[in-house]
């Protein structure tokens, strides 16, 4: 347990599935960096600063976990953080093909960077940030999929989106 690992993602918002993988990674590695990508191409609902704060809230009890926002290539961020392992989550077989391609690209760009795949607990295997946002946007209750304060933040965000639509 000597390696520094990075669990990268957009975390828009952080879900119970993410939290499950972070807990697992924290048991496996000496130091885990949650790398929150700015990722403007995904048009996140929450700002980078909001997402960093949300993940800090969810991981506050884990002493070997650090949350850092970043822009640019993940392999460059990993080098800056002196990390030798990338943690990626696999919810279903359908995730594997994309993750396999990504792991090979990262290995080509940074040969010393290893990808490790973790699977969430069965009860979290279907949860994605995209689905959580869709449920919230349609007025559904997301409290079973995210931390209570994240559910409240999503509710406020949805209300703001609706106000913005009405104002146009």
From Swiss-Prot:
It is an enzyme of class 2 (transferase). Reversibly transfers an adenylyl group from ATP to 4'-phosphopantetheine, yielding dephospho-CoA (dPCoA) and pyrophosphate. It comes from Shewanella frigidimarina (strain NCIMB 400). GO terms for cellular component: cytoplasm. This is Phosphopantetheine adenylyltransferase. The lineage of its organism: Bacteria, Pseudomonadati, Pseudomonadota, Gammaproteobacteria, Alteromonadales. Its EC number is 2.7.7.3. Its cofactor is Mg(2+). Belongs to the bacterial CoaD family. Pathway: Cofactor biosynthesis; coenzyme A biosynthesis; CoA from (R)-pantothenate: step 4/5. One of its GO terms (biological process) is coenzyme A biosynthetic process. NCBIfam families: coaD_prev_kdtB, cyt_tran_rel.
């Amino acid at each position: 347990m000597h390696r520094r690992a990075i669990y990268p993602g957009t975390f828009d918002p952080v879900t119970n599935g993410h939290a499950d993988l972070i807990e697992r990674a924290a048991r496996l590695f000496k130091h885990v960096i949650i790398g929150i990508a700015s990722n403007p191409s995904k048009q996140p609902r929450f700002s980078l600063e909001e997402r960093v704060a949300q993940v800090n809230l969810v991981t506050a009890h884990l002493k070997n976990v650090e949350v850092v926002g970043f822009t640019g290539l993940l392999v460059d961020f990993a080098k800056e953080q002196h990390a030798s392992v990338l943690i990626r989550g696999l919810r279903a077989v359908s995730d594997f093909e994309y993750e396999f391609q990504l792991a090979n690209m990262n290995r080509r760009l940074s040969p010393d960077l290893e990808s490790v795949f973790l699977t969430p607990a069965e009860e979290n295997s279907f949860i994605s940030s995209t689905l959580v946002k869709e449920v919230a946007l349609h007025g559904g209750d997301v409290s079973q999929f995210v931390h209570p304060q994240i559910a409240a933040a999503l509710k406020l965000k949805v209300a703001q989106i609706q106000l913005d639509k009405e104002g146009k």
